[in-house]
Amino acid sequence: MSLTYRDAGVDIDEGDRLVELIKPHARPTLRPEVLAGIGGFGGLFALDVKKYREPVLVSGTDGVGTKLKVAFAANRHDTIGIDLVAMCVNDVAVVGAEPLFFLDYFGTGKLSAEQGAEVVKGIAEGCRQAGCALIGGETAELPGFYAPGEYDLAGFAVGCVERSRIVDGKGVAPGDVVVGVASTGLHSNGYSLARKALMDRHPLDRRFDGLGGRTLGEALLEPTRIYAKDVLALLDAVPVKAFSHITGGGLPGNVPRTLPDGTRAVLEEKRWPRPAIFDLVEREGGVPRDEMYRTFNMGLGLVAVVAPGDEAAAHAALRARGLDAWTVGQIEVGTGEATCEVVR
């Protein structure tokens, strides 16, 4: 009796079919610098160095955590790829870099070309929103490694910034203004807690007041906002001193990452509205407010620090991008390492 790779659980033909299904999604994301499309051994990108005096490449990698479990439970796979791109390119953008290209890893126990194509459709949409090219990726079929119908994702983004325009927070000083930019919801962090608080108690098709008519599942799967073009537009308008992408660790864990020692950010909770999904998690799960702030973005997906004289121009630039933003606090003198405090 002969044994084939398919008998062992790996279907090469299904993988080839997936490649053909994703090409139409990836093709529109390609930039002029891309020299080869999906399917080669490596993605080729010819950086236009003439645009820079001293180019610096910026890289980022991330996943979407257990938000995937919500996608599995809802059997919806066409937006989770947007989250994957967002988690990577937002990190690249907040140092001032333009995202250039993106690669993904998709691992599953039994490959479904249709399911994989839905995921990549979302990845391609995320790349379109970020203005970067989807130039490659890896699909791994790992029999017995994942539960049926489940998969894992990882993303990798590369951008470029002029060395003199790197946003590193070194110029932040007491008296500077903290501007918070609205998130779309939970984004892609804290889902282990959110699932425990909500999905262990309620079905995904339940509707709660405050969710804008959406079901619980729809609210939990709301894609992460991709701020890449917003960041670049804001930098064209004002000299932003620091950016923070608010991910795991929330405001207290992320804002200090780009502040110099001897400073602290003091944010006032009353200065910005909090989307209803956060109140729902807090109420249904009995989650302490401090834990909420240590886990979730609490309505602010991006934070920028600007000089007081640039505050109005910063708000105007963000409004022009269709974003809600608020002056949420200020920088004060601190002691030792930088900190962030949310005052209620």
UniProtKB/Swiss-Prot annotation:
One of its GO terms (molecular function) is ATP binding. It catalyses: 2-formamido-N(1)-(5-O-phospho-beta-D-ribosyl)acetamidine + ATP = 5-amino-1-(5-phospho-beta-D-ribosyl)imidazole + ADP + phosphate + H(+). Keywords: ATP-binding, Cytoplasm, Ligase, Nucleotide-binding, Purine biosynthesis. It is found in: Cytoplasm. Its main location: cytoplasm. Pathway: Purine metabolism; IMP biosynthesis via de novo pathway; 5-amino-1-(5-phospho-D-ribosyl)imidazole from N(2)-formyl-N(1)-(5-phospho-D-ribosyl)glycinamide: step 2/2. It comes from Anaeromyxobacter sp. (strain Fw109-5). One of its GO terms (biological process) is 'de novo' IMP biosynthetic process. It comes from the Bacteria. It holds the Pfam family AIRS_C. This is Phosphoribosylformylglycinamidine cyclo-ligase. Its EC number is 6.3.3.1. The keyword Secreted does not apply. InterPro entries: PurM-like_C_dom (IPR010918), PurM-like_C_sf (IPR036676), PurM-like_N (IPR016188), PurM-like_N_sf (IPR036921), PurM_cligase (IPR004733). One of its GO terms (cellular component) is cytosol. Belongs to the AIR synthase family.
